[in-house]
């Protein structure tokens, strides 16, 4: 019996975390307080570093508003979800057209995509914490703020006496 209850709790926790992705995609910031715990906190490497600690649903609202200004057509696609205890892990892909300031770079009009991993802590049927790790290097490469891995390998292999080998072609 307790095993069934636990499975139901895990599925409920997954649904709560997935609801946050729906709120993001639907631009339903009015629903953030329904999904986020009053003591919500965000931490980790995010696409937008918060101005101070990200505490409370209002802080996440501000983060999403900045996100929508930079990438008005931003969408998140959930690629995987796993739950254990009060934790839910989401692997997702973000993407959209870079129209406003993002990572300090003005809009380029280019489409950008990157992956992120969220570890959500669920309490009282709401998201208490979002510990996120964003692939900031992928974003920086696409915005021209960092060289791509292929560019680095080509530069290293052109140095006389370098033992670095070029990366295989992406066309394989």
Sequence positions of predicted segments:
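C-terminal and inter-domain tail/linker signature
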Residues: 1-172
